[in-house]
Amino acid sequence: MAAASFQPLKCLLLWVFFVITPPVKAVPEPGIWTVPIGSGAGSLFFRKTLYNSTNIKVKLISPNCPTPVKLTVKWYLRSHRCYNQFTNLEEVLERHHTNLDTTDNFCKNVSKPDFCDKNEDKNIDCNKDMHALPTLKMSKLVPKISVNQSAGSKNPLNQMDFDIVARTYQDGPYLFVLQVKGDENVKWNLSVTVSMKGPHGFISASDWPLMIFYMVMCIMYILLALLWFIWSACYWKDLLRIQFWIAAVIFLGMLEKAVYYAEYQNTDNTGVSSHGLLIFAELISSIKRTLARLLVTIVSLGYGIIKPRLGAVMHRVVGMGVLYFVFAAVEGVMRIIGAKEYDLVLLAGIPLALLDSGLCWWIFVSLAQTMKTLKLRKNTVKYSLYRHFTNTLIFAILASIIFMIWRTKKFQLVDCQADWMELWVDDAYWRFLFFIILLVIMFLWRPSANNQRYAFTPLIDDSDDEVEEFLVTDHLAEGMKLRGTKPECNGAPKPPATNIDEDLKWVEENIPSSFADAALPVLMDSDEEIMMTKYEMSKIE
C-alpha cells in the first residue's frame, strides 16, 4: 500500500519533468547585426542586456546612392530596469503615435522617466562614387563611470576606435534605436552594422552565466563518463542491458553540453550565432531526451529486472520513441528558425505535450505493476532498488514544485522583471535536475561484483528454489502411487480392485522400507566417517 500511495506523486513528477519544464533558451543574443536599409525605411531596434562599459559601434557600409543625397543619422540608447519592458516596442510606439521623427517624442513619451542617451549626425554625403561613409561622431552624453575601465577588461578603451557612438554606464537591459533619413524624392540604400562588445566579449550579460554553466556541466558529464567507463571495465562480464542505456544517455548529455558551450563561445568571439550549430545541438538534445524517456519507460516495465525481454511491447516503446524524437526535433528547430513566431512554436509543442502525457500514464501504470510483482515475489533486493528510485522521484517532485513556485512568483506574476540576472537559472535548473536524477540512477544501477542480483531470474529467486525443492522432496512418495492401468477392450472399464493384500504386496516390492535409504544415500555416514567421529569424541573425553 505504501508503494501505491506514491504513484500519483511519480506521475506528477513525470508530468512536470516531461511537459511543464521549459526548453533551453533557443538562441543566444547576438553581438553584431548587419541590416540593409533604404529610402523610406523605418527605425531599427536592437535589444540586449549589456555589461557596464560596453562599446556600441555603428558603421554605414556598402552605400548605393545613384543620386547624391545628404543623410541624417539619429540614434538613441535607453536603459531600463524591466527586462520585459520593450518586448513589444513596435506596439508601444504605435500606441503613443511616435515615429521617432523628434527626440522629444521618444525620450519623453516612451523613455520617461529612465535615462535616454541621444545623438544625431546630419549632412552625411552619399553619392555613387563612395565606397564607404565617414564615421559617426560619438555621443557627448557619456557617463564618467564608463571612462574608468578595468585593466583586465577584454575590451579596453581605445581612443583610435572612431566607430564608437555610445557606451553603457551600468549593467542591465538596453534598447538601441537607429534611424537613417534622407531626401524622400531620392532613392538610396546601404547596410548598417551595429556591434556591442563588452568586458566579456560579444556575449550578452544574461547569456554569459549560461555559457559558464554549460562549460561546468560539460566537465561534469566528462567525469561521469570516465567513472562509468571505469566501473564497466571492472565488471564488464556482468553488465546488464540497462547499464548500456545509461552509458548512452551520459554520452549524449556530454555531447549536448559540449555543443551548446561551443555555440555560446562562438557567439562570444564572433558576435553572431550559428543556426547550423544550434540546430545540431537541438537534434542532440532531442535524441538525449528521447533516450532518457525510453530508459524510464523500460525501467518501469521491469525490462531486465523481472522480464528478460519485452516482446511485442518493445515495438510500442520504439514507436513512441520515434514519434517523440520527431515532435521534439520539430519543436526545437521551430524555436531556432522561428523564435519570433511564438504561436508557431506553441503549435509545434502541442503534439509533444500530448505525447508526453501518454508516456506519463504508461510509465505510471507500468511502474505500479512492476513494484506489485516484486512485492508479491518477496524479492527484497529488487524491491529496495525500486523504492530508492521512488524516493529519488519524490525528491525531484518537491524540488520541481518549489522551483516552479519561485519561478512563477519571480518572473510571471510581476509586471517588471527587474531580476534579469537570475533569468539564466530558469534555463539551467531543469538541466541540473536532470543531471541529479541521472546521477542517482547511475548509483542505483552501477556495475558491481553482485551485478546479477538485479538481473532477471525465472519466476522465483534462490530462496524460493530451496523451499520448492524441500516441498518436492517431501511429497515425492505421494507421486509414486500412480500406476499404469490397462484399458479394457470391451465395454466400460472395470472398477479398481479393492484387494488390500495385493496393494500392500506391490508397495513392498516397489518402494523401499526406508525412503531415506533410497532417496538420500549421500546423507548417510560412511564407516570411515563414523570411525573419525568416535576418534574425535575419545579425544574430547
From Swiss-Prot:
Annotated InterPro entries: GOST_TM (IPR053937), GPR107/GPR108-like (IPR009637), TMEM87A/B_GOLD (IPR054101)
Principal location listed in the UniProt entry: membrane
Transmembrane segments: 210-230, 242-262, 294-314, 317-337, 345-365, 385-405, 423-443
Keyword Protein transport belongs to the record: no
Pfam families: GOST_TM, TMEM87A-B_GOLD
Example GO biological process: cellular response to mechanical stimulus
Topology term for the membrane: Multi-pass membrane protein
Disulphide bond pairs: 65-116, 82-416
Glycosylation positions in this chain: 52, 109, 148, 189
Entry GO CC: Golgi cisterna membrane; Golgi membrane; plasma membrane
Keywords: Cell membrane, Disulfide bond, Glycoprotein, Golgi apparatus, Membrane, Signal, Transmembrane, Transmembrane helix
Membrane topology, Cytoplasmic segments: 231-241, 315-316, 366-384, 444-541
Residues of the signal peptide: 1-26
Compartmental location: Cell membrane; Golgi apparatus membrane
Residue ranges annotated as Lumenal topological domain: 27-209, 263-293, 338-344, 406-422
PANTHER family: LUNG SEVEN TRANSMEMBRANE RECEPTOR, TRANSMEMBRANE PROTEIN 87B
Job description of the protein: Potential monoatomic ion channel gated by mechanical force, implicated in normal touch sensitivity through the generation of mechanically activated currents. However, a direct channel activity is debated and an alternative could be that it functions as a chaperone for an unidentified mechanosensitive ion channel. Could also be involved in cell mechanosensitivity regulating cell adhesion and migration. May also be involved in retrograde transport from endosomes to the trans-Golgi network (TGN).
Family: Belongs to the LU7TM family. TMEM87 subfamily.
Protein name: Transmembrane protein 87A
Organism of provenance: Xenopus tropicalis
Gene name in the database record: tmem87a
